[in-house]
Amino acid sequence: RRHILCYDDSPAVLDFVGSERAREVAMVGSACPDHLVHTKHWPLFVDWDGVDVEGLKARLAQEIARYREAYLRYVETHRSPQDPIMDPSPRIVLIPGLGMIATGRDAFMAGVARDLYHRAIAVMHGATALDRFVSLTPAEAYAVEYWPLELYKLTLRPPERELAGRVAVITGGASGIGRATAYRLAQEGAHLVILDINREGAEAVAADLVARYGEGRSLAVPCDVTDEAQVAEAFRQAVLAYGGVDIVINNAGIAHSAPITETHLEDWDRVYNVLVRGYFLVAREAFRIWKAQGIGGSMVIVASKNALAAGKNVAAYSSAKAAEVHLARCLAEEGGEIGVRVNVVCPDAVLRGSSIWDTRWREERARTYGIAPEQLEEFYRQRTTLKVNVFPEDVAEAILFFASDRSAKTTGGILTVDGGVPTAYVR
């Protein structure tokens, strides 16, 4: 089961975990019976010298395994035959010099565990200042944690959604396909990190996702995908906010249309910087995280019909999109050994809500076809086999398929969402 993590290095936490008697006091037990449901009776306390990071990683894995075994022994000692067995993973992890990591089924519940343990720290400080800190016995703690009425409340929860506990990073998430994808993944329980060069747009999407789906459900990070440092910082913020990354939607967009003789070098470089360099930088950072996490991942590259079919007056854009498709194939080969899947969605003519189509791109494409800009939607509809227009929500459904376990055995694949364009049929 996947959890969302909440990291806390506040002064109160660092002072407590760094104190001489921190382990002794913390392992006495919970500070309040009401906390048990959210924090468990005991935290996981992991000693660390503050220097050996690789050693800490190895020790964390070992200590979590030991904690789970100890929790299962505690349950088996006190449970009745009809009692369920809760998730044995720790809810609170304390590490001297680093702070506290709280966990939960989503960001809100991880935040609840964090806040409750702050209160526990205050209680432990107060008790030890006056005398000593005492808690419930294991039997008493079990009776509270597995109280029948509390167990009944758990049965009233709605079933977990398909992407519950997963974190998705979306580039170009402030508008168009990226925005629609953020909402679709959120509907399935994902936490969203919205990356976009448009800070206000990204913040608006993230704020609306939080309003709709709950506290902590989304984070906005302004990011120029062509900037190596900004990409690395964006992923760092995602990991600090939620504990890791599971899904990456490589979607940042730009477009340019002109005959090759009128395509300036700066135009060519600008398109390739976003669509090739940017997609590479995002993919590289994602792979670094996935390799460290060791639990796989899923990347969806949003290419274009133009990656598969030659087009007039779009040499820079089309060739860059073709490069994205082959990048995805190469990444799929590298990702297989670490459980990472990489797939491609190729949409076409998604005009609604797109920041690209609100620029000169619309006029340039209309000029290429010899029609007025306002005629583009109907022109694109008529040229499709199905005689339909394609909307951002249509593409979001295809992205969800590749991002989720529905496509668990597919990598290196291409899914077109174009209404049927014969020249772009995948062969």
Report residues per predicted region.
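Short C-terminal tail/terminal secondary-structure segment
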Residues: 399, 411-427
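Active-site loop immediately N-terminal to the catalytic Tyr-X3-Lys motif
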Residues: 258-261, 309-315, 337, 387, ...
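Substrate-binding pocket helix/loop in short-chain dehydrogenase/reductase
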Residues: 259-260, 264-272, 362, 380
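Residue(s) in the substrate-gating loop at a strand-loop-helix junction
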Residues: 304
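Short, small/polar-rich loop/turn modules that mediate ligand/substrate recognition or access, typified
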Residues: 249, 336-341, 410-412
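Alpha-helical segment proximal to the catalytic Tyr-Lys
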Residues: 288, 333-334, 408
